[in-house]
């Protein structure tokens, strides 16, 4: 890919609620995780670098397919049970690595479709990842705020990203 795993992972962490740490798995012999073949297989369904899917999985689960987060997200891709149900998958099925990754990609594709007005491919990835992380409703709210305050609702950096942070401030609502 055109970006190294560390660079891609750092960018995903920057979009995440959690602070970026240097605690990134070491890439050994070109392998990031035992699930690399599954990331490669399912990345084709969204047209993304498989390392970006691996980055999401590392952030969501540290590559543990049976983990349940503090918020209740399950599996390698950190899918919420209601999201899984909406995609026809039970929370138990998310523990299967292939199903978990496929469901994560289905979820990402749905979020991406929600940003059809964003034409720049890199911007669309940023918005899609942000929606995956924070929920699409929060991103739509931040876009409305960006528009209201004269920023570009279709640009992430220094535009919509600022309003994600300010959304909790009633002065901006």
Locate the predicted segments by residue.
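Extended ligand-binding regions for polar small-molecule ligands
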Residues: 1-15
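Catalytic glycan-binding domains that act on GlcNAc-containing polysaccharides
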Residues: 12, 18-173
